[in-house]
């Protein structure tokens, strides 16, 4: 309720104006890039990830249904959250994310949305299977058109 004044039926002059654009399924960006949504769960909250050609970005989840997993198979690059080693109510653990990455079979998976509790970058990367790595500040991923 911190910013509830923004959502009042009669807006107050000078407050931010929001144009809602609900997205679901497949849509095109203003630059004509096709994007597909992936419905995932963040504890009890439905959230979405995105697929851009053979690249997917799913960074706030702890559950993905079997039907939505199908959308994530055959990717070149998957970016997935892996918060820490210990269980968490709304995020994949390192072990859960690793198992999911193996199941989905992307050519390269990067884990992101990690806490300091996951361990040292170099140590964790040494534990991960080939094709799965921790993301890092400044990582750049080239996406095909």
Model feature map: region roles:
Residues 1-58, 123-145:
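Binuclear metal-dependent hydrolase catalytic cores
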Residues 37-38, 58-60, 80, 111-112:
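Thr-Gly-centered strand-to-loop micro-motif
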Residues 44-46, 64-67:
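A short, acidic/glycine-rich surface segment
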């Amino acid at each position: 309720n911190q910013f509830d004044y923004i959502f009042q039926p009669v807006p107050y002059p000078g407050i931010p104006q929001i144009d809602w654009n609900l997205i679901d399924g497949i849509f095109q960006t203003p630059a004509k890039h096709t994007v597909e949504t992936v419905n995932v769960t963040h504890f009890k909250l439905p959230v979405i990830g995105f697929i851009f050609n053979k690249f997917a970005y799913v960074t706030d989840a702890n559950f993905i249904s079997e039907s939505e997993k199908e959308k994530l198979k055959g990717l070149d690059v998957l970016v997935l959250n892996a918060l820490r080693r210990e269980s968490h109510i709304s995020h994949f653990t390192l072990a859960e994310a690793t198992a999911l990455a193996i199941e989905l079979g992307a050519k390269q998976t990067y884990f992101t949305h990690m806490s300091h509790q996951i361990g040292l970058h170099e140590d964790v990367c040494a534990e991960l299977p080939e094709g799965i790595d921790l993301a890092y500040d400044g990582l750049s991923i080239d996406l095909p058109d």
